[in-house]
C-alpha cells in the first residue's frame, strides 16, 4: 500500500482509493470521503479515527469512551462498527462508564476503583447490577459467593 509517489509526495488517488476501501469495509454508508474531518459529525469522526487504526493494521484498538457525547444514531453507528471489527478478529479494549454499552459490546468486563482491580468477569456471567455493585462497593459479589 504505497500512498506516496517515488519522490515522496502523497499520491492523492492512491490515498482516496485506500480510504474508500477501508471505509466501505467499516462503514458502507459513509459517503463523505473528501470532506474535512472537522466538518463531520461525532460518529463519523469516530469512524475516521478507527479507520486510521485499521489502515495501520492495528491488532488491538484501545477506545476511551468511544460513544461519549454522541447522539443515539451516532452511538449505534459506532457500536455497530465496534461489533464489525470484533467479528473481523480485531481486539478491542473499551474504556467506558456506560454499563449497557459494556454489556452489549464486550466479552469481559474489568472494574477498577481507586487504581485497584476489583474484578474481571465474562459479560454472560454478570448483570449490570453486579457491575454497579463492584463500582460502588469496591468488591466483586461473584467472589464473595
What are these regions (language model features)?
Residues 1-145:
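Glycine-rich phosphate-binding loops of nucleotide-dependent enzymes
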Amino acid at each position: 500500500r504505497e500512498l506516496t509517489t517515488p519522490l515522496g509526495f502523497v499520491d492523492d488517488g492512491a490515498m482516496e482509493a485506500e480510504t474508500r476501501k477501508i471505509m466501505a469495509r467499516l462503514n458502507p454508508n459513509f459517503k463523505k470521503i473528501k470532506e474535512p474531518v472537522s466538518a463531520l459529525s461525532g460518529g463519523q469522526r469516530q469512524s475516521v479515527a478507527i479507520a486510521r487504526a485499521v489502515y495501520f493494521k492495528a491488532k488491538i484498538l484501545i477506545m476511551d469512551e468511544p460513544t461519549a457525547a454522541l447522539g443515539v444514531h451516532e452511538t449505534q453507528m459506532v457500536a455497530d462498527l465496534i461489533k464489525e471489527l470484533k467479528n473481523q478478529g480485531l481486539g478491542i479494549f473499551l474504556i467506558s462508564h456506560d454499563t449497557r454499552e459494556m454489556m452489549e459490546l464486550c466479552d469481559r468486563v474489568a472494574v477498577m476503583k481507586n487504581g485497584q482491580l476489583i474484578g474481571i468477569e465474562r459479560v454472560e456471567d454478570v448483570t449490570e447490577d453486579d457491575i454497579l455493585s463492584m463500582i460502588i462497593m469496591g468488591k466483586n459479589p461473584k467472589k464473595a459467593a
